[in-house]
Amino acid sequence: MPKDRTRRRFLASDVQLVVERSSEHPVEYAIVLLVLRNGRWGTVRTFDNAHDPSEHHEHAYVGLEKQSPTVTYGPVNDAMYAAELKLLRDWRDIVHAWEHMQ
């Protein structure tokens, strides 16, 4: 299903959380933590279920390079809630770690 719903939330002037999801079932989603550096938005962390509705990936990034995911299984709503909550609670630490791996 195409992701036809997008919600953006600025966590700081240079950090945003973007949630994209499909309206129809099975729900496909991507939840992305973005950071503005040197005039460009870069991805720091991605959560998605691109391969299967019940297979959830968490991708960290080193620079621009996506790392192998941590994979979990379960209901879409639970995974989306957990991903968004993790980013809302821990975004400062996640961004700090990403900046020190550049």
Tell me the role of every PLM-derived stretch.
Residues M1-N38, G42:
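Negatively charged, low-complexity tracts enriched in Asp/Glu with abundant Ser/Thr
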Residues D4-R5, L17, H56-H59, L85:
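Intrinsic disorder/low-complexity segments enriched in polar/small residues
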Residues A12, A30, A50, A60, ...:
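A sequence-composition feature that detects small, non-aromatic residues
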